[in-house]
Swiss-Prot record:
Localization in the cell: Cytoplasm, Sarcoplasm
Residues at which nitrite binds: 65
Principal location class: cytoplasm
Organism: Cerorhinca monocerata
Protein name per Swiss-Prot or TrEMBL: Myoglobin
Amino acid sequence: MGLSDQEWQQVLSIWGKVESDLAGHGHQVLMRLFQDHPETLDRFEKFKGLKTPDQMKGSEDLKKHGVTVLTQLGKILKQKGNHESELKPLAQTHATKHKIPVKYLEFISEAIMKVIAEKHAADFGGDSQAAMKKALELFRNDMASKYKEFGFQG
């Protein structure tokens, strides 16, 4: 399931474009997640009041959390699959404190893919999309494995 060097290069190349505007990308990813999958809002106590796209657009807290999410994911992606030290604490908090189901990681992966495709269509062709999809799947699978270690079936 690992990625080739070329695939990692594609992932990190497009990720560089994401990092050029973490706040904008992160905000859009979370808005997309909550709009496409409203049930995910139940896991975020401080965002439960955000019911409309306008409320979400105006939320500085949502924007800040988007930066946090994409910053953490970026740290993991940059490890090119050797992400145990970055992944373990993230999995622990998501399994034991936040109780985020693996399915929700799939949902946010979809949102990430959609936002990148919308914002960077010219740079996110079929090969880059396939590589990113594979990298996000590796992340989710490894999170799911860690969840089990922490006793969370997610």
